[in-house]
A protein has these predicted regions:
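Gly/Ala-rich beta-loop-alpha elbow adjacent to hydrolase catalytic centers
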Residues: 109, 113
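Conserved HGGG/HGGXW glycine-rich cap/lid loop of the alpha/beta-hydrolase fold
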Residues: 28-77
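Alpha/beta-hydrolase fold catalytic core
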Residues: 1-40, 62-65, 102
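Active-site loop/oxyanion-hole signature of alpha/beta-hydrolase fold enzymes
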Residues: 72-108
């Protein structure tokens, strides 16, 4: 029996990946587009991960944005943690934002994001 692989047309894995230390919890961060372009953050919803943006982020990157997303703690390639709370999620988001720059940047989210 052959295995059929179905891909979303236009989907593209990130151009760069890295990790941010959130007080001992490793947060996986993904970027599409030019590193010197204006940043735009994408926040995924609950029970999801940043890979959900593999179809949408490249379109934004092709439009001139540096698209940055991250796997929330306990999701995707980010570490699991002893603490899960809205406060922890917000601290993690702020650490990711600080790792990108200190200028105001748009954030797009869905569901919990």
């Amino acid at each position: 029996m052959s295995e059929e692989v179905i891909r979303f047309p236009g989907a593209r894995r990130p151009d760069r990946t890295r990790r941010v230390d959130a007080y001992g919890v490793g947060i996986a961060v993904y970027e599409w587009g030019a590193p010197d372009a204006r940043p735009l953050l994408l926040a995924h919803g609950g029970f999801d991960f940043a890979g959900t943006f593999d179809g949408f982020a490249p379109l934004l990157a092709d439009g001139g944005w540096r698209v940055v997303s991250w796997d929330h703690r306990g999701h995707g390639d980010s570490d699991h943690a002893a603490l899960y709370s809205w406060q922890a999620d917000l601290r993690d988001a702020l650490l990711v934002m600080d790792s990108v720059g200190h200028e105001p940047m748009p954030i797009v989210g869905h569901s919990k994001g």
